[in-house]
């Protein structure tokens, strides 16, 4: 086939411009990305060769070779991995097939350090070569194809690329970077080695360079016809913990998670017994951009006896821990394991249970840290992943108690929206006569904090948790108690503060009897709007509030379901009135404006809890009429 000249996809042109003009100060990343791609190519070959050993073509020793040519001003990265066919070269090097292209550009922050890390995360690392090169030549042949089906791909990064069919005996890919002016400092064995050791020391494949020795006569380093391995070349998780430095763990995390930031914590151990496996797990310091996407694929990298099997093996972790990154290397699973087999395997179930326990232990260690740095780390974790962790209350019955101890909430104990109160902290501060853990749900912290339902709790100095995450109502349908103390909504049912409100209860019964004519007339006036009307002692400043019956859906949950486009039963609340409030005291069952006052008290209560009025115009008209009558 003759040479073809083709145009880059529009997004690639934009990306090339970014690489060349915006990321220059962090140019070392080009080598990290190209070595990482070479490592992936070797993993893919190993995986495909499980079913077709002939793909090794009598060259089973996988490696990456790095070289440079001072005279030609080139750097070459060569691998004997899976290689590419002509169609694959065009698809992989000329277009970005991922749906995340737009997200990639929207995430660019202008911070070169952060933006550089996004490159690997979005699978566009190859183009980082243009940071230092004004021309890139790729020669490749896919394993299993004849030598006559080699491919040469070349581009100057200016919108077009050329593809040609060539004769290539060797399997794999050779990338040659033709350096830009001013990049000659990279043409040094020492410089290239230092970049590899900084970013790619953990790569399980040997990275080879020609050995150099000092030549006394020439007064310079001279290349020898002998290879040396310039990285550790062993899978980091297979080493003893004592042999791995914190810096190496951090670099490995950045490689495996495609993340530029350090992890908050990690755990590394080998499990022996019924199932034998090694796990190296990390807690990231921030959430990925697509964590809440429906098609987000979390999970760990799965290896079997050090052979890479798959990315995103979500069967190894429950959904609520999908943010955990890392590697599991099993000694028991078959090498031809598929995602379908993973779902049915007993060994996988045992691994999943073990990984879950280990991940929770890691989070418990973070949560229970007593030093300021440790506490700050858990705050960072909670801010990024707290809402995801709450899913575990409903998903993981076996570990529900452990997950509950990790939860954090805002509360009336502090005057900020910081979610830093553990359920154990709340229980430790409970009043001697208090038997329940009280909470209120709302759309915002401000709405929760100012909820009229909290008035009696403030009066009595009883702490209330302020729950404002969308997942909270769902979570509470599974979290019924903690440490033997039931959780109770301050906006549901007939409020019972136990011994804390004996006097008020007695007074409420007496007042309720005295106000029965007014209450009955209000119920008749409001009709289907309310399930009931009753006198309450839970209010001290507000004239009225709405509460849900014990077995009914709350107004907050109903609004949330509607916002999500789901059907929800109509909300028929109980209207509670404060008999000590002047507006309620002024109510007269036989008054001409009694109906207007009833509707006003209902509408005010609905607004106070974050609800929406069905007929705002009537509310305004009614309010104006009552104001005018008072003014007169």
From Swiss-Prot:
Residues 340-559 are annotated as: B. Residues 1-339 are annotated as: A. Residues 560-632 are annotated as: C. One of its GO terms (cellular component) is cytoplasm. Keywords: ATP-binding, Chaperone, Cytoplasm, Nucleotide-binding, Stress response. One of its GO terms (molecular function) is ATP-dependent protein folding chaperone. Pfam families: HATPase_c_3, HSP90. It is found in: Cytoplasm. Molecular chaperone. Has ATPase activity. Belongs to the heat shock protein 90 family. Homodimer. This is Chaperone protein HtpG. It comes from Burkholderia pseudomallei (strain 668).
